[in-house]
């Protein structure tokens, strides 16, 4: 008789959020293995907030909802003073007391070992042998400020099924004006190179799941062109240079109402409901970045609205900020073999969306021989 293990995968960019994560999800789905991938641990002011971030991780681990998870592995890269390696990534893995057959890979001795207790690792993680962590090199984007972007990898055997779980944080769009200059944008090209690097760095044929903040954006130039077909365009440049400061699109009728205003960190569209109606399905045709990886990566159907940039105000959890064009930045991607795995057990792959860009997936892994 086959044994099934319920696995919950969660990715959350916690740059401005340190509250309870998915209590109702844990209670409702009762997973046996939980993988939480966090990005921007400590937030933008990480030098001041890292202590609060650490408290958040320990509070979550000791919460009432986690009492039946008797083993865990927690990795937090909090060494912001080590600029060459700091990624601000955090990965937490919780194992339920009913799950017996689980092992983790030691990348130093190149062997799997049973997980028997709660393990916490906080620091640069350079000497921790059960995790691989890397900050993307400066030459990945020489024309832009070097930021705390990178990836963190762990490897597991769950009921004789081996798999990699990779926490990823790719580069963002620094300027809306630059993003809509070309299709694809220069930022998209940078993300493409970095993600290909992550995939090619794996030294195994095991199935893998990549989940984190990919910062994938819509094809902004194509989207803006389609949104503004019946609008007049006004370009405003800085007095001291020929540099574009803002682009304003006004409706040709309706008293020339401003339809769309774009600045470096402003994307204010009049009809914001289009990003939420029918989970933003009409915008999926502009979501093109993942298509470049279809040779090695698959993704289940997106059944939630764009995950970014939700308001950071707790009273406005479903409202988008006017800072960026909404997009599906937070994703859970998988290798072809990983998708075959979840489809082979005829599972119902649950796609959930909650506030503040958290993306959750529930899957089942069945027991069979071999990795």
Give residue ranges: language-model regions:
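N-terminal, active-site-proximal structural segment of metallo-dependent hydrolase catalytic domains
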Residues: 1-92, 101-102, 121-142, 152, ...
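Core residues of folded domains in eukaryotic genome-function proteins
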Residues: 3-10, 30-37, 88-90, 103, ...
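Short helix-loop capping/hinge motifs at secondary-structure junctions, enriched
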Residues: 99-104, 339-340
């Amino acid at each position: 008789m086959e044994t099934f293990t319920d696995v919950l995968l969660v990715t959350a960019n916690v740059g401005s959020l340190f509250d309870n994560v998915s209590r109702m999800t844990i209670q409702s789905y009762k997973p046996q293995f939980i993988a939480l991938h966090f990005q921007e641990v400590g937030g933008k002011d990480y030098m001041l907030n890292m202590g609060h971030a650490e408290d958040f991780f320990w509070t979550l681990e000791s919460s009432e909802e986690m009492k039946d998870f008797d083993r865990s592995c927690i990795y937090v890269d909090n060494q912001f003073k080590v600029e060459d390696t700091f990624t601000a990534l955090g990965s937490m893995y919780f194992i339920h007391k009913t799950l017996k057959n689980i092992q983790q890979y030691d990348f130093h001795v190149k062997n799997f070992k049973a997980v028997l207790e709660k393990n916490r690792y906080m620091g640069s993680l350079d000497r921790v042998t059960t995790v691989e962590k890397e900050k993307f090199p400066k030459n990945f984007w020489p024309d832009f400020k070097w930021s705390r972007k990178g990836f963190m990898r762990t490897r597991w055997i769950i009921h004789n099924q081996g798999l990699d779980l990779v926490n990823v944080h790719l580069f963002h769009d620094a300027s809306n004006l630059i993003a809509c200059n070309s299709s694809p944008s220069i930022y998209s090209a940078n993300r493409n190179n970095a993600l290909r690097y992550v995939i090619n760095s794996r030294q195994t044929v095991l199935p893998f799941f990549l989940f984190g903040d990919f910062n994938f954006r819509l094809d902004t130039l194509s989207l803006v062109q389609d949104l503004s077909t019946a609008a007049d365009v006004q370009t405003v440049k800085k007095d001291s240079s020929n540099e574009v400061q803002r682009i304003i699109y006004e409706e040709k009728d309706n008293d020339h109402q401003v339809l769309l205003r774009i600045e470096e960190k402003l994307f204010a569209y009049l009809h914001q409901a289009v990003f939420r109606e029918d989970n933003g399905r009409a915008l999926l045709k502009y979501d093109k970045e993942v298509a470049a990886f279809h040779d090695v990566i698959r993704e289940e159907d997106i059944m939630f609205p764009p995950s970014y940039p939700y308001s950071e105000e707790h009273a406005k959890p479903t409202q988008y900020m006017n800072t960026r064009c909404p997009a599906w930045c937070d994703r859970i991607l998988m290798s072809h073999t990983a998708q075959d795995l979840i489809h082979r057990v005829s599972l119902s792959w649950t796609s959930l969306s909650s506030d503040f860009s958290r993306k959750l997936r529930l899957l089942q892994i069945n027991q069979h021989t071999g990795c």
